[in-house]
């Protein structure tokens, strides 16, 4: 058996999330169907770095699976992409030892969130950005990002549906935002993220940009450990799982 690590991109618009569900089209479902066909009717279970919700996209999701087939890495990529629908692509395939695990070996994850900040929505971007018609104050949001960096208990920024039973302490190494034209890109890089954590943080950052909150309010929100202190969870379509990094052979890859 060989362990294969795959870097996967997908457009989440037409998927009911990543995790397989009966009677729903999911990313895991189409990946496992492609592997089923490659293995001539044998079911192959995949493991992912994490799950994404309905409408959330991925540039660099990572999965692994074990296969008895002896195929060169480059041929794996070509074969799988031939069997996959157009909204899912294998970007890279690497052979790994059995110690590698797509979920448990993760060192760092990076998410990006895109906001279209102009009066009128763009019909061609509607499934790929969050539209905010009110002018946002970029400098205030940049200041607020700094308060999210570091090691904190992110209970206030975790969905009530979170399955995490233990500590909700996480470390964010980098949080920032920058603007290009009318598009604002937010970047979150950390050791791990709670369920809906990025989308809840985005809700607060947008409120700061609108002048509804002050940047330093994040200090009190973190201390309160109360999800009710924060408003809605932001829409999924602006969110992208950008990159997953692993510590392998002493290198962060």
Curated annotation (Swiss-Prot):
Pfam families: PseudoU_synth_1
Keywords: Isomerase, tRNA processing
Record-level GO BP terms: tRNA pseudouridine synthesis
Isomerase as UniProt keyword: yes
Enzyme class: isomerase
Record: active site: 53
Reactions it catalyzes: uridine(38/39/40) in tRNA = pseudouridine(38/39/40) in tRNA
Quaternary assembly: Homodimer.
HAMAP family assigned to the protein according to its UniProt record, in alphabetical order: TruA
NCBIfam families: hisT_truA (TIGR00071)
UniProt protein name: tRNA pseudouridine synthase A
